[in-house]
Amino acid sequence: MDQEQMPILAALEELKVNRVVPFDVPGHKRGRGNPELTVFLGDQCVSVDVNSMKPLDFLCHPVSVIKAAEDLAADAFQAAHAFLMVGGTTSSVQAMVLSALSPGDAIILPRNVHKSVINALMLVDAKPVYINPQTHPRLGISLGMQVEDVRRAIAAHPEAKAVLVNNPTYYGICSNLPALVEMAHAADMLVLADEAHGTHFYFGEDMPAAAMHVGADMAAVSMHKSGGSLTQSSILLTGPNVNADYVRQIINITQTTSGSYLLLSSLDISRRNLAVRGKDMFRRVLQEADYARSEINAIGDYYAYGPEIIDGDAVYDFDRTKLSVNTLELGLAGIEVYDILRDDYDIQTEFGDLGNLLAYLSFGDRPKDVERLVAALAEIRRRFRRPGQDMFDQEYISPVVTMTPHRAFYAAKESVPLAETEGRICAEFVMSYPPGIPILAPGETITEEIIRYIVYSKDKGCSLTGPEDMAVEHLNVIKEG
């Protein structure tokens, strides 16, 4: 297919030329009714913030320009079908899981998944078969799923309908996806890939394996993260063994009927950009990331991991564009360095946790920006270094799963002070955001270690979300008796 084409963009440009008089929504009427919005966003933007109409197609039932854009995306990603999504990759992940499972079904998955996965299990009332990942002894981060762990889970749960894989994790760690696909398919299970952080795997060279390229059945891809489209835009990819018509039915259960043409056109334009220029763009990103990694490691006390941690299994590969920097030898938590960078140096990184800082590099970064980050980290070491601190060094605590997320979330519950929750079954999520990986999920027993982790995270300034009590002083737990 001709990847230079941008059918949604072309249709919007034609609409502007035709000067159609709008007696439909949105009510700002191409910006004329809201001049402040037009000044802020610009006429070019508000003039194409329009409603679905025949020349522009309909996202819920595409037959013309949106269908053409989806066909081009499928071709670019080497998938059987692609769905343009406007609810973020949360909506892509949830549609993927809901398409693969029915109530009561089991799914094999790592516990270090995004909350959207567990929310989908809660909605469909599926049973999670968690594989607890190993943690790296120095970095404290959770790794990928080991092949033997998945093999044992498949043998113990032959009734499972699917295996879900993070490709990569938030920290850039990749499992042995080709082996997992082969193993799952041999057991007649689908393979679902959360590729929220792996768009570039499809277009760059010297990248980890992309899910569709190794035979996975579905993949949720965050185009807005490393693909250049607008925030909240995403693509759901399916393989030849998946009923795409059924998937669209599932998508339409929750997806808006007022799909934003700003988001849709950004997907169309960005897909073309990746297909035409992706190799060159990501070659430069890799060069910048490798340079930054080397410079940061030369500062001292920081550790930006590289290929030395690859072990052929739990770390089968890693995403070189991710700049994950361990800060513990500095005597500072990752979230503390994150805050200093933002507050003192006007540098916004992706996130900081208890031991690590993540800088997200893309083709939008300039060499001078990378130099500024490296220089700031060096100065932070000089100004704030305090070695010998007693630091919490693990980012993942294996949960004790007591009941399904669905059952726990809808059970009778009561609010209990955090300090008194040990041994109780949690009825809600607790997580740091970003990255949105639950510390606790509904149905998991609260342990003393988890309570200490939550208290420590709050003390270090992590943004904890999920509980009904936004201060996270109390947690909802299952009522006893």
Can you say where each PLM-predicted feature lies in the sequence?
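N-terminal "arm"/small-domain region of PLP-dependent enzymes with the aminotransferase-like
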Residues: 1-64, 435
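Conserved PLP-enzyme active-site core in the AAT-like
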Residues: 5-13, 17, 37, 61, ...
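Conserved N-terminal alpha-helix of the aminotransferase class I/II PLP-enzyme fold
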Residues: 46-91
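Short glycine-rich or small-residue beta-strand-to-loop segments that form or flank ligand, phosphate
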Residues: 56, 83-85, 163-166, 324, ...
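A short N-terminal beta->alpha junction/helix N-cap motif
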Residues: 57-61, 280, 438-442
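Structural signal for conserved beta-strand scaffold positions within catalytic alpha/beta enzyme cores
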Residues: 84, 130-132, 221, 351, ...
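Conserved C-terminal alpha-helix-loop-beta "cap" of PLP-dependent enzymes
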Residues: 291-467
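Charge-dense polyanion-binding interfaces
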Residues: 463-481
